[in-house]
């Protein structure tokens, strides 16, 4: 038996980063393209762009940037830090939930 936990980071009551946005940023980092990242994540380009902009507005910091005269997109140091924090928290939560299930099953 498994216990599943869905969580995300919010600021001022609005979503900043969850699993989907983390995956989107990682796909941008790997491929350098929002269009390709959106395809990989199974969402439209417009939806991907909207999610990024909403997160950036809530944070007050850019998560992606483009270089003048160049095609493509790169994630910012802020985005890299958020991805790292997300994975760190997620790993700890997964271990904790597994431990809770294990202890609960032993008690019965």
Language-model features and meaning:
Residues 1-13:
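Short, Lys/Arg-enriched N-terminal segment that forms or immediately precedes the first helix
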Residues 28-38:
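Short helix-boundary/capping micro-motifs
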Residues 51:
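Residues within the DNA-recognition helix of helix-turn-helix
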Residues 57-62:
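Residue cluster at the C-terminal edge of the helix-turn-helix DNA-binding motif
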Residues 66-89:
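Basic, amphipathic "hinge/linker" alpha-helix immediately C-terminal to the N-terminal HTH DNA-binding motif
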Residues 82-104:
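Alpha-helical linker/hinge and terminal dimerization helices associated
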